[in-house]
Amino acid sequence: MKALRVVGVLSLIVVAVALACAKGPTGKAPNFALKDPAGKVIELEKLKGKVVVVNFWATWCGPCRREIPGFIEMYEQYKGKGLEIVGISLDRGGWEVVKPYIEKSKITYPIVIGDGALVDKYGGISAIPTTFVVDKKGNIAKQHVGYMTKEDLEKLVKDLL
């Protein structure tokens, strides 16, 4: 009987550890310093004091394209209240593909281009879009994999602002 209890407790610990590991990175958000299409460097470290939404996406990704209008609305609504959004494109075609898409979609928040090394720093990304919410102290507060509505995003960031 006692052995069954020990096995049960150990099983719960294993499940808890597995779930914690599956969440992706926690703690301090990995820094990046990447240029936007105008050549301005966007550095995560310099955004401390703001809630930062870091969104990994690509122009060819349908769910990514669908969530962008809501991200634009959130940015316009909350940028004066301490919200920053940084879109990190994972398009292999680089600015040649991304810049026309930014213009066509009228994206108002900063867009930069990431690479495999940055993806690795964020714990590897299994799907896009993947969004990290970084609190005012620079720590990853939340992570969301997949499409997100404006309302979903608002729920993730509002309490942190």
Regions found by a protein language model. Name each.
Residues 43-62:
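Short active-site neighborhood of thiol/selenol oxidoreductases, capturing the structured segment around
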Residues 1-10:
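Bacterial N-terminal signal peptides that target proteins for export
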Residues 53-55, 87-89, 132-133:
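Hydrophobic beta-strand core positions in alpha/beta domains
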Residues 19-45:
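N-terminal "domain-start" segment that seeds a small globular fold
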Residues 100-108, 113-158:
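Thiol/disulfide oxidoreductase modules built on the thioredoxin-like
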Residues 51-52, 83, 129:
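Alpha/beta-hydrolase fold active-site loops
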Residues 65-105, 114-121:
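Structural microenvironment flanking redox-active thiols in thiol-disulfide oxidoreductases
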